């Protein structure tokens, strides 16, 4: 089947298409790539292509799907293609995949619209911060403190706010209204124990997309930066190296867990205490059943707390993956765990 594999090159991240068919491939970029895509769009429903990307909010795939092009995807785990191959070799390998391993591409225009609003909001915030800092630097360079700013400088800084609120306030309302309509956002808020609509679920869902593209929960963990590298450590960004995980998703999750702990979130806090207690038990002695080795680090509380945070994140992500995967389970393992912890807490108080 005609296969598309895309990579980005250069500082400008120009998209490069590797198109394969019958075991041979060609590299297209710039005007040639656009002309080839226009040709595929013109044929419409007569075209059938296989994409190595299954992202439901991919602009290129959404445009092709809108024109009626039949798009299929295949999980990397099911086809057994090594991700370390050259781009052209990856496209050739996917073009030979059996039809039984293919699955229809799911286009999510609602998530794409949400993603656009989130990106716009983030850009406005960065612009406001940049301009405000530049104006404040005027006072720093002239040696004037904030309480002695001249009137014109105060007016310029205040102009970045509307009705006493940041300029992104209206965008926040639009993002929240959009998130209310998307089932994944509602599910995220419920599983993470969040009462009110916030920007958090919109940020996470808009960068993760439809979870059906992940064959296992481990794939979702990996995409969100919750996996362990070959050297046994958490993943980190490296200069000049491409990431196979999403830094934005990991940042959103870390902030969500951190805020939940500070606010005594009814879901996050009990789970954290439960996992931290288990980590403290096995920190010095290890665990023969799981093969965990004893740890003799000097920062026992901090180490166990960090491991507990990671376990909470992975557990909640697992529940989110199950809930959005169409299983229809109402009473999850997480809910049972929370009920058991609450019962234990009531018993301990009574004693």
Q: Can you describe what each PLM-predicted range is?
A:
Residues 88-96, 118-126, 130, 202-207, ...:
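Short, hydrophobic/amphipathic alpha-helical patches that form generic packing surfaces
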Residues 97-102, 210-213, 258-267, 321-332:
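Short helix-capping/linker segments at secondary-structure and domain boundaries
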């Amino acid at each position: 089947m005609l296969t598309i594999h895309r990579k980005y090159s250069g500082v400008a991240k120009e998209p490069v298409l590797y198109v394969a068919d019958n075991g041979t491939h060609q590299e297209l970029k710039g005007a040639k790539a656009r002309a080839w895509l226009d040709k595929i769009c013109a044929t419409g429903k007569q075209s059938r292509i296989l994409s190595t990307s299954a992202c439901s909010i991919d602009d290129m795939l959404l445009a092709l799907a809108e024109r009626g092009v039949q798009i299929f995807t295949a999980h990397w785990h099911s086809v057994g293609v090594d991700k370390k191959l050259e781009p052209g070799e990856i496209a050739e390998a996917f073009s030979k995949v059996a039809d039984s391993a293919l699955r229809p591409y799911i286009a999510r225009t609602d998530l794409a619209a949400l993603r656009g609003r989130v990106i716009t909001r983030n850009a406005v915030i960065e612009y406001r911060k940049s301009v405000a800092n530049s104006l404040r630097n005027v006072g720093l360079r002239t040696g004037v403190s904030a309480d002695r700013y001249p009137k014109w400088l105060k007016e310029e800084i205040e102009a970045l706010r509307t009705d006493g609120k940041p300029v992104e306030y209206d965008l926040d309302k639009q993002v929240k209204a959009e998130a209310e309509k998307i089932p994944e956002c509602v599910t995220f808020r419920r599983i993470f124990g969040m009462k009110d609509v916030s920007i958090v679920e919109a940020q996470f869902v808009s960068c993760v997309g439809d979870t059906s593209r992940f064959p296992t929960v481990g794939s979702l963990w990996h995409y969100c930066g919750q996996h362990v590298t070959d050297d046994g450590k958490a993943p980190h960004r490296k200069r000049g190296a491409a990431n196979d995980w999403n830094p934005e998703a990991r940042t959103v999750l870390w902030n969500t867990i951190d805020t939940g702990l500070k606010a005594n979130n009814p879901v996050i806090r009990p789970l954290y205490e439960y996992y931290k207690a288990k980590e403290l038990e096995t920190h010095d002695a290890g665990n023969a059943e799981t093969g965990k080795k004893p740890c003799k680090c000097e920062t026992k509380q901090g180490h166990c707390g960090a491991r507990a945070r990671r376990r909470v994140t992975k557990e909640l992500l697992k529940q989110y993956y199950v809930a959005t995967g169409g299983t229809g389970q109402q009473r999850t393992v997480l809910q049972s765990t929370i009920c058991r912890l609450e019962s234990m807490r009531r018993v301990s108080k009574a004693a």
